[in-house]
Amino acid sequence: MAPQNKVTTSGKDNNMDKQKALEAALAQIDRAFGKGSVMRLGSREKIEIDTISSGSLGLDIALGIGGLPRGRIVEIYGPESSGKTTLALHAIAEAQKAGGTAAFVDAEHALDPVYAKKLGVNTDDLIVSQPDTGEQALEITDTLIRSNAVDILVVDSVAALTPRAEIEGEMGDSHVGLQARLMSQALRKITGSINRSQTLVIFINQVRMKIGVMYGNPETTTGGNALKFYASVRLDIRRVGQIKDRDEIVGNATRVKVVKNKLAPPFKQVEFDIMYGEGVSKMGEILDLGVKAGIIDKSGSWFSHDSVRIGQGRENAKTFLREHPEMTEKIEKMIRHNTAEIADEMLDPSIPED
């Protein structure tokens, strides 16, 4: 028995020595690099992730945390005219509604202030930059993030971040890997600042086709692989259909897939309407999510809630909800109470991560 007690005492002493050595190491790091350079995760005052709404109720549910995460990088990519900039502008509008400051780095030189205003963006307070080169765009991005005064920053788009050497060179000159190196260097530099400033940084990206790919997905995004690694959330947005009013096309049916999510389970997908001149249709989302949650009954082409007929056909039902805000608000509250059930239905295991 005596030797056993000896071993136990020796083990306790060893643990105490380890603890003292750890405390000394932590104190040394704090002295060298400043207080808070290293800490126990449980000692942090706030562990929950702050979010900014995407402007789409369905997408907020699919993201699993109630919106787009602050202090992180988000990539929105897809084909041309799929709604990438529209989604980013909706996020800006939501941030501004909450009293935040927004910035838009317009590398494509294609921002339409009239359309942005229609989506709810306060264009008078929006900080806009139209840089000449990719280096200039990313330097401006870095400076705005380091100011700790910007809540959301959108870069539109990665494909338009042209390196200075390419702009100053001749047409036809080869500049292999220049843009990828530029993005890789910039992301290494700004990631720490983004986390400290709690800025939501959205990079809009385009898709390209890989040449000679016979099997698997031939699509890839521009700017190399760095953004894929640094992004906490990657959203693939696609136009999947047209919305018509008789013979006139008035909008697009849009599908967004969460192909990467470091903060909640990924591989969820959501569909919503993007109406021309209006953006994401809130009424359309409430209608679709209400049906998914069993709050709105759909019988044939008729929609009803609490035995009250909302309308025949989707567009008529949307008009009814628009004209009855009390019912719309009630249904929206019920949807928000059933987010877990709705999120389970959004799972799409077929989504590949490229």
Curated annotation (Swiss-Prot):
Entry GO MF terms: ATP binding; ATP hydrolysis activity; ATP-dependent DNA damage sensor activity; damaged DNA binding; single-stranded DNA binding
Principal location: cytoplasm
One of the record's GO cellular component terms: cytosol
Keyword Transferase attributed: no
Keyword Nucleotide-binding appears in the UniProt entry: yes
Gene Ontology BP, a term: SOS response
Binding, ATP: 78-85
Keyword entries, A-Z: ATP-binding, Cytoplasm, DNA damage, DNA recombination, DNA repair, DNA-binding, Nucleotide-binding, SOS response
Compartments, as annotated in UniProt: Cytoplasm
Record Pfam families: RecA, RecA_C
Coiled coil: none
Family: Belongs to the RecA family.
Purpose: Can catalyze the hydrolysis of ATP in the presence of single-stranded DNA, the ATP-dependent uptake of single-stranded DNA by duplex DNA, and the ATP-dependent hybridization of homologous single-stranded DNAs. It interacts with LexA causing its activation and leading to its autocatalytic cleavage.
PANTHER family: MITOCHONDRIAL DNA REPAIR PROTEIN RECA HOMOLOG-RELATED (PTHR45900:SF1), RECA (PTHR45900)
Protein name, entry field: Protein RecA
Provenance organism: Zymomonas mobilis subsp. mobilis (strain ATCC 31821 / ZM4 / CP4)
Gene label: recA
